[in-house]
């Protein structure tokens, strides 16, 4: 089984971790932006199923 020849340096592992955290932060920011757009009614660029109103439920 292959194994690494040398130990990964602290600087390299911290840099990788920082990149990973940055990507996670960006995804969280995008999710919050989309959520705000949906709640404020400014959403035009994507589709999501709307909840049925009480009037529509009575018809079925």
Curated annotation (Swiss-Prot):
Keyword Ribonucleoprotein: yes
GO BP annotations listed: translation
Keyword Ribosomal protein in annotation: yes
Domain of life per record: Bacteria
Keywords: Ribonucleoprotein, Ribosomal protein
Cellular component GO terms, alphabetical: large ribosomal subunit
One Pfam family recorded for the sequence: Ribosomal_L32p
Secretion signal span: none
Record GO terms (molecular function): structural constituent of ribosome
Designated name of the protein: Large ribosomal subunit protein bL32
Family recorded in the similarity comment: Belongs to the bacterial ribosomal protein bL32 family.
């Amino acid at each position: 089984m292959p194994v690494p020849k040398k130990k990964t340096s602290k600087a390299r592992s911290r840099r990788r971790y920082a990149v990973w955290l940055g990507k996670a932060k960006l995804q969280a920011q995008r999710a919050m932006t989309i959520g705000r757009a949906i709640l404020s009614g400014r959403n035009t660029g994507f589709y999501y199923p709307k909840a049925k109103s009480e009037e529509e439920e009575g018809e079925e």
